[in-house]
Amino acid sequence: MNARFGPTHNKQSASAGKPQPALVVYAKAKEKIVSDISKRNSNKSDFSDGNSNPASVTVFHVGPEDQDLRTLADILNRTDWKLCPGTRWTLAASDDVSAAAARLTGETVPIVLCERESVAGTWKDVLESVGRFPAPPMLIVASRTADEYLWAEALNLGAYDVLSKPYHPAEVVRVLSMAWLHWTNHRTPAARAQAN
């Protein structure tokens, strides 16, 4: 019996013939679930272009160029996107809401990450602008003061999610991966044709 993790698991180890601690069994089960999700996604949703070139996913950041933006860039560059195999993530940015809206008009961008308040506007202004696009991006609000009120307001007005700052890599990867999958699965046929 392990005092911290409880009794050993009853299943016998195939390789050693000894009982495995519950923690080891849990870790192996978690690893298998992640592996199964990756296999299912790679079989069902290969985001490459058919020539084994990864799909490029652009995250457009609206807000100041600060340490948080550099952290976000590092997360995008160093992450293995297990939920979105066959993707390459890039970051574009603008610190001005009106300039961002103008730039987004000419591009197909799946995800917009917007600071709660930015130069000459708020996330609500960006949401209103991108809401008119044929394939509107998933808007994610970022804030150091992310609370239940902001989360409820953002979701009720049509934002996809809220990320708290400073950015935590696992949470950023989870939210961005789910936003990308949601965007690709809900695009209209007309928007798909326009993007291709």
Describe the predicted segments one by one.
Residues 136-146:
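A short, hydrophobic beta-strand element within the central beta-sheet of small alpha/beta folds
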Residues 54-77, 90-93, 112-113:
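Conserved acidic segment of CheY-like receiver
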Residues 105-107, 129-136, 157:
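Conserved phosphotransfer cores of two-component systems
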Residues 97-100, 110-133, 147:
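Conserved phosphotransfer microenvironments
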Residues 167-176:
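C-terminal output helix
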